[in-house]
Regions:
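Membrane/wall-proximal cationic-aromatic binding patches
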Residues: 1-20
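Conserved SGNH/GDSL esterase-like catalytic core that processes O-acyl groups on lipids
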Residues: 15-99, 119-122, 128-131
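Catalytic His-Asp segment of secreted/periplasmic serine-dependent ester chemistry enzymes
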Residues: 121-195
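A short helix->loop->beta-strand "cap" motif at the edges of active sites that frequently abuts
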Residues: 105-109
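Conserved beta-strand termini and adjacent loop/short-helix elements that scaffold enzyme active sites
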Residues: 51-53, 113, 150-155
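Alpha/beta-hydrolase-fold catalytic nucleophile elbow
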Residues: 81, 113-114
């Protein structure tokens, strides 16, 4: 697939063998986040492996996780950045959340960055779809105590226009400053659950 990047399975298995290992799974936002998150996590003794693909909807991320799990290469901790490409068919999102949670199992911790899409051309429709996805993730988190939401969407919604533009210039993809903020929020959420 165009833009699909991932560690080979042996490298994933090495990270999976470390109790503090983390898998970054997601879409083009995950690809942007990757360097900042890897360095942030590694500073705190969390080695990271990855599988991301520009334009990937959550069903394809779930497919990738099933394959990683089948290869016994799934770490104890997952960071998921997915949903931005589900705004066109939000009704399909809950099934994919459940596939990911079932594949991860109850012993792993899943940190899902809440998606926010707010493109200049369609701000109202994008915001409505993003809000639906957020509600679906929030509902899933009430049923899965090991699903932790990283409140990226809330942070961007609460920001003033200048801050929002500096963190997410196109309404979807974080800037270099934005990825640092997102990486820090992910680490804070992981740390708050004592991993």
């Amino acid at each position: 697939h165009y833009g699909h990047k991932n560690d080979p399975i042996p490298a994933m298995k090495k990270v999976a063998g470390n109790p503090h290992g983390v898998l970054l799974l997601g879409d083009s936002v995950a690809a942007r986040l990757h360097p900042a998150l890897a360095s942030t996590l590694e500073e705190h003794q969390h080695p990271m492996t990855f599988d991301h693909w520009n334009g990937r909807p959550t069903h394809a991320a779930a497919d990738a996780l099933v394959a990683i799990d089948a290869a016994n290469a799934q770490p104890r901790t997952l960071v998921i950045v997915s949903g931005e490409n589900d705004i066109f068919e939000p009704a399909l999102f809950p099934v994919q959340i459940e596939r990911i949670m079932r594949t991860a199992g109850p012993e792993r911790h899943i940190y899902w960055v809440t998606p926010l899409v707010r493109r200049a051309a369609n701000p109202t429709a994008d915001e409505n779809a993003s809000t639906r996805l957020h509600g679906m993730l929030t509902e899933a988190a009430t049923r899965h105590p090991n699903l932790h939401l990283v409140p990226w969407a809330d942070k961007i919604r609460a920001a003033n226009d200048a801050t929002r533009t500096s963190l997410v210039p196109d309404g979807v993809h974080p800037s270099p400053e934005g990825v640092k903020v997102m990486a820090s929020m992910i680490l804070d959420t992981i740390t708050s659950t004592n991993l």
